[in-house]
Amino acid sequence: MPARYAVYYAPSAGDALHQAVTPLLGRDALGGLNVPQATPPGVDPVFWKAVTRVPAHYGLHATLKAPFELRHSGMDSQLLRSTGEVASRFLPFAIPSLSLAYQGKEEKGFYALVPSTKCSLLSFLERACVMDLDAFRAPLKTEDVARRGHLSLEERSNLYMWGYHRVLDSFQFHITLTDGIADA
C-alpha cells in the first residue's frame, strides 16, 4: 500500500490542550506512543474505550489537508518543502476557545472540540493547505469515492476536485474525540 500524507494541526507537547486531551485518547500523537487512557468523570471506562477506538489510534489532531497518496513517487521532499512554504505565509495565531460539540448526522455523528467562535485565519490556512498542496495528490481511486457514500452535489464536487468532501466552504475545524455514536 502506498504511503499517505496529510496536513494536521496538533498542539505542542507543553500546550494545555495536548496535556488535557492526550490522556483521554490514550495516545500521544506527537511521540507516536500509547499512554494510559483516562476516562472522563461520570463515564463508564468500558464505554469510553469503545467509543474512542478510532480517535485513540490517531491521537489528538485536526485535519487541514485530508490524507492522500502522492501523484508521483519521490515527491515527499517537495511536499514537505511546499508545506513549509504554505505555513511560512501565516503568522502564529491563537485558535479561539474550544467547545464540545456533536458533529454529523444523528445516527452516525461524533463528539469533537470545535472553535466556540468563527476563526477566519483557520479557514484561510485550511484553504491554502487544500489548494496549494493539491498538485501533489494522486487522483482518487474508485474505492475512495465509493467509501464516501451519499454526498450532496457540493460535497461530491469537492471530493473530485480536492480529494475530500468537507473542504473550503464546507470545512469546519474539529478535533475528533469519539467514534460515530448516536447523540445522547
Indicate where each model-derived feature is located:
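Basic, often amphipathic N-terminal segments
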Residues: 1-96, 100-105, 124-184
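Positively charged, aromatic-accented nucleic-acid-binding surfaces
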Residues: 115-119, 123-127
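Short, conserved secondary-structure transition motifs
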Residues: 101-117
